[in-house]
Regions:
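S-adenosyl-L-methionine
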Residues: 1-187
Length: 187
């Protein structure tokens, strides 16, 4: 199925979640072209608005994208009371209360919180499409090996976070590695 033109802001947010997902990235990369074209969006997966995970996907997508008050109307139009009971799957360092009105506390701002929310979107989109988690993990490890290494603290651009979820700048991380950083979070 192809992505239908959005009939509301809510469907636009769901389309954005799909477009940002690992599976959509994999599909686009496997086309063999070096660029994304407008017609590629018509080939994106369509998620059922009735699926039990739709609201969770929408919340994470909104919190990743509604960064300033310019997006207040979008946040308010897409607001769902179920957002109040939605809990993150992965750890959040800066989880602040949200409500139907956009505030500066609405977006996820810490690098690790944002990365975790995107990972949750990747998994939920896969679940909504019926893709087994093992297949998603295989795609992640084999087709996105650099991202996999970065997520696991390896490589030139490794994602390493401080105790508050902020990503360490590369020069700081490199200096830390020269001093032989601990090999696990417990260290």
């Amino acid at each position: 199925a192809s992505a239908a033109p959005p009939d509301s802001m809510h469907s636009l947010i769901i389309a954005q979640a799909v477009a940002s997902s690992l599976l959509a990235d994999f599909m686009t990369r496997s086309s063999g072209r070096g660029h994304i074209h407008a017609h590629d969006f018509n080939r994106l997966f369509v998620l059922s608005p009735e699926h039990e995970l739709t609201s969770s996907v929408a919340l994470r997508t909104l919190r990743l994208n509604c960064l300033t008050d310019v997006y207040a109307d979008l946040w308010e139009e897409c607001w769902d009371e179920s957002f109040l009971t939605d809990t993150p799957i992965l750890e959040r360092h800066d989880e602040r209360p949200i409500g139907p009105d956009w505030t500066a506390d609405t977006p996820l701002r810490r690098a690790e919180d944002r990365r975790n929310a995107q990972a949750e979107i990747d998994v939920m989109v896969a679940m909504m499409l019926g893709v087994p988690i093992e297949d998603l993990c295989t795609i992640y490890r084999t087709q996105f090996a650099v991202l996999y290494d970065y997520d696991h603290g390896r490589g030139q651009g490794a994602y390493v976070y401080d105790a508050n979820g902020r990503q360490l700048p590369t020069p700081v991380r490199q200096a830390w590695e020269k001093r032989q950083r601990p090999s696990s979070n417990e260290d």
